């Protein structure tokens, strides 16, 4: 929105040419989302509290969690609102990737909103039935995959790459591309949701991964950097740095209220949408495997649930005291802040490893 105005004003004053720089607009997007979150946060929390929007607590969960009963949830609505406003202000609205990612965020956010609403109204910790949730996620995930496949304008946009091995490039045709896109979008949507079980646990890794994906997006959309780093050149992908920056800013603003002890929970409206956005951006910039590395905390949390369920069904025994794995450490006696910060540290290390793949080719 403001980019178009700046382009017109540039004819009168060259200073407005700054808005043509992705990095400059990325910084503005992050700051806008951050300050909007800090400004709007208290009002949103008060409104959620008035709606009795408290998160139901698992009865079989750690005893320390019962003190969280009544804490407002659906705080992810603050993230979605501030990200959307920031992107509309500073993004290039002629870019199809911007609209796709916003659409994915809103659609998955709508699923999360309905899930949260059921939990609040019916006081049911399980929320929306899994089959309906996965059906809706599948519809939106497949739609995003089909859109990316049929709008791809360069071969690199539908090629699967393995990090650190520049010679390995697997062209994807039709169904194979859509299936991979589907699994990454829906998979990371649910992975972030599973991770969101402690105060601030999910949002900080999300911020870190978003920042790193912004670096990949910027490089992938730049001819010089893409050639130098030997990564796929995806025209238009650089604009995704605006969305990544907005997520980082909004995420930090939300963490101000979500840090231990949390004043508000993100809820499925935030977790499902942010995870889907990370997966979508990774698919666009062709860094699916790098996302698996950088989002390793989300992957580990998901695997812990899969292992726990499979083990119990096959042997009748549990591998962990409770899944997802962050609850396992809580039941081992780790204080909640220790679990959170240690998972953050792991996330920082994994993101740095992911960024290192830019040079290791």
Curated annotation (Swiss-Prot):
Pathway of action: Cell wall biogenesis; peptidoglycan biosynthesis
Gene Ontology CC: one annotated term: plasma membrane
Cellular compartment(s): Cell inner membrane
One GO MF term: metal ion binding
InterPro entries, A to Z: Glycosyl_transferase_4, PNAcMuramoyl-5peptid_Trfase, PNAcMuramoyl-5peptid_Trfase_CS
Main location: membrane
Domain of life (superkingdom): Bacteria
Entry-linked Pfam families: Glycos_transf_4
Catalytic activity: UDP-N-acetyl-alpha-D-muramoyl-L-alanyl-gamma-D-glutamyl-meso-2,6-diaminopimeloyl-D-alanyl-D-alanine + di-trans,octa-cis-undecaprenyl phosphate = di-trans,octa-cis-undecaprenyl diphospho-N-acetyl-alpha-D-muramoyl-L-alanyl-D-glutamyl-meso-2,6-diaminopimeloyl-D-alanyl-D-alanine + UMP
Record's signal peptide: none
Transmembrane segments: 25-45, 73-93, 98-118, 139-159, 168-188, 200-220, 237-257, 264-284, 289-309, 339-359
EC category name: transferase
Protein EC: 2.7.8.13
GO biological processes: cell division; cell wall organization; peptidoglycan biosynthetic process; regulation of cell shape
Membrane topology designation: Multi-pass membrane protein
Known cofactor(s): Mg(2+)
Keywords linked to the UniProt accession: Cell cycle, Cell division, Cell inner membrane, Cell membrane, Cell shape, Cell wall biogenesis/degradation, Magnesium, Membrane, Metal-binding, Peptidoglycan synthesis, Transferase, Transmembrane, Transmembrane helix
UniProt xrefs under CDD domains: GT_MraY
Protein task: Catalyzes the initial step of the lipid cycle reactions in the biosynthesis of the cell wall peptidoglycan: transfers peptidoglycan precursor phospho-MurNAc-pentapeptide from UDP-MurNAc-pentapeptide onto the lipid carrier undecaprenyl phosphate, yielding undecaprenyl-pyrophosphoryl-MurNAc-pentapeptide, known as lipid I.
PANTHER family linked: PHOSPHO-N-ACETYLMURAMOYL-PENTAPEPTIDE-TRANSFERASE (PTHR22926), PHOSPHO-N-ACETYLMURAMOYL-PENTAPEPTIDE-TRANSFERASE HOMOLOG (PTHR22926:SF5)
Family statement: Belongs to the glycosyltransferase 4 family. MraY subfamily.
Record's protein name: Phospho-N-acetylmuramoyl-pentapeptide-transferase
Organism: Xanthomonas oryzae pv. oryzae (strain KACC10331 / KXO85)
Lineage of producing organism: Bacteria, Pseudomonadati, Pseudomonadota, Gammaproteobacteria, Lysobacterales
The encoding gene: mraY
